[in-house]
Swiss-Prot record:
SUPFAM superfamilies: Ribosomal protein S5 domain 2-like (SSF54211). Belongs to the imidazoleglycerol-phosphate dehydratase family. It is found in: Cytoplasm. This is Imidazoleglycerol-phosphate dehydratase. It comes from Rhodopirellula baltica (strain DSM 10527 / NCIMB 13988 / SH1).
Length: 202
């Protein structure tokens, strides 16, 4: 995977190319939700649009994958690329809030998402979707996308569905709540430019 940083350390562009996918992705943590998402998977593009808007990050994704097989590799590799980009954009984590959490209602759904951008991976996910498909999209890929993100962003991510029944609504709720938690965690802390750890390093 190749990448480059702009003059701002919180902007990263990278390319991930494998035998299954070819992904170009750029992220700006100090954005406004701008950018274009083109994964070849309509439902995933919709979720990425929500992520960019609610996290207030600029996000551009151009992906070509083996969609003739299924959506798995493309969704997974976009999660990997996005997590990697966020990790690199955060650098040593100095001056960020580090933690974020958000409980978000959407119609009959309620989801809590909590994030620690502390440089270590942990993932706990309890947001089951009863239906195996959301349209043509495998519903299990919602969880897999976020696990792939968390591994590569080197973060703790905990997602909990309190209640909800509609698969589309649950997915939206998960993406919006997690986006809002990420927004809080990566924001610059106006009270401190230090690394947010008593160890002095993350």
């Amino acid at each position: 995977m190749t990448s480059s940083n702009s003059n701002s350390s919180r902007e990263v562009s990278l390319e991930r190319k494998t035998g299954e996918t070819d992904i170009k992705l750029s992220v700006n943590l100090d954005g406004s939700g701008a950018g274009k998402r083109d994964s070849g998977i309509g439902f995933l593009d919709h979720m990425l649009d929500l992520l960019a808007k609610h996290a207030l990050i600029d996000l551009t994704v151009e992906a070509k994958g083996d969609l003739h097989v299924d959506d798995h590799h493309t969704a997974e590799d976009i999660g990997i690329a996005l997590g990697t980009a966020v990790d690199r954009a955060l650098g040593d984590r100095a001056g960020v809030r580090r933690y974020g959490h958000f409980t978000l209602p959407m119609d009959e759904c309620l989801v809590t998402s909590a994030v620690d951008m502390g440089g270590r991976y942990a993932f706990e996910y309890n947001a089951p979707i009863a239906a195996s498909k959301i349209g043509t999209f495998d519903s299990e890929l919602v969880e897999h996308f976020w696990q792939s993100f968390a591994v590569n962003a080197k973060c703790n991510l905990h997602v909990l569905l309190h209640h909800g029944s509609n698969g589309h609504h649950i997915s939206e709720c998960v993406f919006k709540a997690t986006a809002r938690a990420i927004r809080m965690a990566v924001e610059s802390d106006p009270r401190s430019d230090a690394i947010p750890s008593t160890k002095g390093v993350l």
